[in-house]
Amino acid sequence: MKHRIYILVLMTTGVLLAMACSKGGSSSGNNDGPHPIPSPVDTMAPALTVNTPSSNQVFTSGNVINITGRITDDLGLYRGSIRITNDANGTLLKEQLYEIHYVLAYDFNISYTTYVTTASDYTVTVFFEDHGYNSATKSLKVKVNP
């Protein structure tokens, strides 16, 4: 009897763990798709630092925008995204999605080479969340000149 209970507990734990680590949904933070079962003990939001670029930094066409920083969480991260959007028309210029289950600290680094014929304003948005639905978002503006 003990053996059967042990197997049942292991199977239940495995199913719950698989559900908690599902890859469903998007990293937009809109909860527009399936999301893992939230962790009721995870109440602290991740800490997000964006090192580069700086807010309102000016680039010239052909320059590379490097987006670097660090995300940490006390109980582990779930997923995130980094996006560069053209403010004039809403075009998504670059998107990097992350699934980094239960990682406590992650250094991110992506690059985007700019090409413009007229001065353009871009928004850089960095978003990450943990398994408790807690999230951290930072957005900043940059300008690209021809």
Where in this protein do the model-derived segments appear?
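Proline/serine/threonine-rich low-complexity linkers at boundaries of modular beta-sandwich domains
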Residues: S28-T49
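C-terminal edge beta-strand
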Residues: P36, K138-V144
